[in-house]
Amino acid sequence: TAAVFVKFRKKPTKEQLIEKLESYRGVPQELDLPSAPKQFIRYMQEDDRPQVQLDVDYENGMGISIGRIREDSIYDFKFVGLSHNTVRGAAGGAILCAETLKAKGYIQAK
């Protein structure tokens, strides 16, 4: 779980920020890799989400859950982000890296 504070050169509206987060597609999504989450980032509208027990396994642990987006007096926005440290950060991240390397031709079968 992370408390995130962001500031932009040109401040978007909250709705624009949510739309950009939800529509984000990275290289793993563009390549349609087997372990890549279909929707990498999801925004949760509930005031008490994301929560570890309820949301850590989103997209089999490979997705990111974001919620509680609020305007901030120092930064533009603040929000809570949640990802699975072992699945997304270590084991699953390593698998995703290997899949990316193979898809881009850096790893080839003998």
Per-range role (PLM):
Residues T1-K78:
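C-terminal substrate-binding/catalytic lobe of Rossmann-fold NAD(P)-dependent oxidoreductases
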